[in-house]
Structures are given as structure tokens and as C-alpha cells.
């Protein structure tokens, strides 16, 4: 079915101004000469006025729309970062600057965050933690992004190195990271995007991953709050009409950045999927290829959709019951995986 929502495309360039027809020049020069003989302003001022009026303005560069937020942005390389979400790692740094913030279940029923940066990069971000086996398949939707992570068990490192991802771990590239801040180790590792991306100069630029942005669709259920229980931790989103976005909380505490800003997004996706044990038998493997139910939160309402991703290199689509693509609100998107 044809998609009626807005797809991220560049805007049209500025229209060129109309130039004064060449045949008017002799007339203007003649008038200028007459003006000079009668004591009027010098001919040069009249010519200058004509020249200013007839010069076309510079054509503006076509505006690019981020496929991750639906907002105007530069088309930059994609930087994916694994972010610590242990209680001792909070508050995190620069999650408010990400285009997409994801929340994943890890071992012990705890949660971890992944953040996607492309529209702009902060100076510092973190705390950075380890990667998981499912990240290799999950992040392929961004083609060949740079992946910043502290380290991982050897089997996961091997998978990352054999994949199209550009792994930039602390173990291999310590000069792109630093220890600091108020948190105790191991919750105090921070990365610098400029240095991280310098290690992955061929990282893919932002491209369509299946998100669509547009006006709020009809229907939906008015919703004030939605909680995802990960087992030993939980993530909650509360609608704020005042801020016109969903405010995030971790384990009942308001999620904030080290900048003091409250974290949250304009759109929240709660994607239900299977999470069998990975090859280690200890960590959930979040299935991001397949299909299932997803609840999309926007504008104070919950919309029931169906998510589908046919392969690791395919986009993830979110479809309403009538077959239309679910339009997201423009701005930061949060994606939370819930075990079904």
C-alpha cells in the first residue's frame, strides 16, 4: 500500500531571481547621461541600483532531512554507542544529543542503552560499556556504522570484526576514550565522537531505516504512562503535555543527563520480540529480524502496530492495522525491546 506519511527527502532548492532583460541597459545609460547634464545624481549610482536589483541571490543548499528524526540535519556518518545503564552509571552524558536511544535487556534482567548519533555529535559521551552478540545483526540496519564499545567476550569481538560494522573498542583504541567523571570504575569510561569516527573513516552516512514521520494518525488510545519490565529493572515513559514529549524514567527514577536535562523522546517504540539465550547461554539474544507487535507512543496516545524486518540488511517497518505505515512525531526516537 502506498505510504501516505512523510518520507525523509531533501527539500527543493531556492528559486532563482529574475534578471533584468538586456535590452533595458541602453535606456538606463541614456537616462543617466541626461540626469548628469541636469545636475541629478551621477550615472554610476543609477547603474549600481540596477546591478543590485538584477543580481540573482545565491542558491541555497538543499536541506537534508534526517531519516532518524525527521528534522533538518547534516548527512553525517552513523556512530552507534553502547551506553551503561547500571544505577551506578547514572546520570549518563549526552543521551539527549542522540537521534535514537534504545533500551535493551541484558543478563540478570538489567538493561543497557544503545545510542545512535548522526545529526550532530557531542564532545563527550558515555559511560561506554560492552557490546553483545545481537548487536551485530541489530546494527546492520544502519549499513556499516561505527560501533563504540568498551570490549566484549572474544566470540563477540570475532563476530564484530568479521561483520560489516566498524568496531572501535576501548581495548583496541584507548586513545579515543578517557576515564573520568564522578562515577567509579567500570562506570566511568567516556568516548570522544571525533576520535571514534576518525578510527572509522568509511562509516556509512545516515540513510533510511524504515522510520516515517508525519502528522498524528487517527485512532490511538489516550495513554499517560507505559512501563517495560526487564526483570530486575524497568523503563517507564510518562506523557508530558507541557513538554510535548514522553519523559523517561529508569527503575522509578527520572532519567536525566549530566547536563541536568530530563531525558525523553517525541516518539517511543515498544517492540515485542523473542530473546532466547545467545551462544554463551547467559545473555539474551534480542531477535531484531522477524515480526511482531509494537506499541508506538506519540502525542499522548498509544498506537498498536506490527513491526517487520525481513533480514539483517532490511529496514524495520511499523504498520497500522489498516496497512498504512505508522508516522512518528519529529524528534528523538526511543526504541525499547520487550520480551514476548
Predicted segments, located by residue:
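Sec-dependent N-terminal signal peptides
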Residues: 1, 28-45
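N-terminal export and membrane-targeting signals
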Residues: 4-32
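A surface/extracellular/periplasmic glyco- and lipid-processing/surface-interacting theme
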Residues: 55-100, 107-340
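C-terminal region of N-terminal signal peptides and the immediate post-cleavage residues
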Residues: 39-61
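Interaction-prone helical segments in low-complexity regions
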Residues: 2-4, 51
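Serine/proline-rich low-complexity intrinsically disordered segments, especially terminal tails, linkers
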Residues: 6-9, 47-48, 68
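Intrinsically disordered, low-complexity segments used for protein-protein interactions
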Residues: 19-27, 45-49, 66
Amino acid at each position: 500500500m502506498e505510504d501516505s506519511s512523510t518520507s525523509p527527502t531533501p527539500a527543493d532548492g531556492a528559486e532563482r531571481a529574475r534578471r533584468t532583460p538586456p535590452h533595458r541597459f541602453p535606456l538606463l545609460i541614456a537616462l543617466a547621461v541626461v540626469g548628469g547634464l541636469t545636475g541629478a545624481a551621477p550615472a554610476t549610482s543609477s547603474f549600481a541600483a540596477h546591478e543590485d536589483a538584477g543580481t540573482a541571490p545565491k542558491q541555497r543548499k538543499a536541506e537534508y532531512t534526517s531519516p532518524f528524526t525527521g528534522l533538518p540535519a547534516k548527512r553525517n556518518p552513523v556512530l552507534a554507542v553502547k551506553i551503561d545503564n547500571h544505577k551506578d552509571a547514572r546520570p549518563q552524558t549526552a543521551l539527549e544529543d542522540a537521534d535514537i536511544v534504545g533500551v535493551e535487556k541484558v543478563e540478570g534482567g538489567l538493561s543497557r542503552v544503545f545510542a545512535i548519533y548522526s545529526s550532530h555529535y557531542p564532545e563527550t559521551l558515555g559511560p561506554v560499556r560492552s557490546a553483545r552478540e545481537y548487536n551485530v545483526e541489530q546494527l546492520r540496519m544502519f549499513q556499516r556504522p561505527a560501533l563504540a564499545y568498551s570490549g566484549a567476550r572474544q566470540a563477540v569481538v570475532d563476530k564484530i570484526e568479521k561483520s560489516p560494522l566498524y568496531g572501535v573498542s576501548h581495548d583496541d583504541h584507548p586513545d579515543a576514550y578517557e576515564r573520568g567523571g564522578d562515577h567509579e570504575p567500570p562506570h566511568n569510561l567516556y568516548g570522544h565522537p571525533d576520535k571514534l569516527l576518525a578510527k572509522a573513516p568509511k562509516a556509512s552516512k545516515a540513510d533510511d531505516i524504515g522510520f516515517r514521520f508525519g502528522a498524528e494518525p487517527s485512532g490511538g488510545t489516550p495513554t499517560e504512562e507505559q512501563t517495560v519490565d526487564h526483570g530486575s529493572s524497568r523503563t517507564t515513559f510518562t506523557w508530558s503535555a507541557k513538554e510535548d514529549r514522553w519523559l523517561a524514567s529508569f527503575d522509578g527514577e527520572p532519567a536525566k543527563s549530566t547536563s541536568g536535562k530530563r531525558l525523553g523522546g517525541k516518539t517511543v517504540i515498544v517492540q515485542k520480540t523473542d530473546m532466547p539465550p545467545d551462544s554463551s547461554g547467559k545473555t539474551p539474544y534480542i531477535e531484531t529480524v522477524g515480526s511482531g507487535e509494537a506499541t508506538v507512543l506519540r502525542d499522548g496516545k498509544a498506537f498498536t502496530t506490527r513491526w517487520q524486518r525481513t533480514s539483517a540488511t532490511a529496514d524495520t517497518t511499523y504498520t497500522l492495522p489498516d496497512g498504512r505505515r505508522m508516522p512518528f512525531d519529529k524528534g528523538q526516537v526511543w526504541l525499547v525491546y520487550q520480551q514476548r
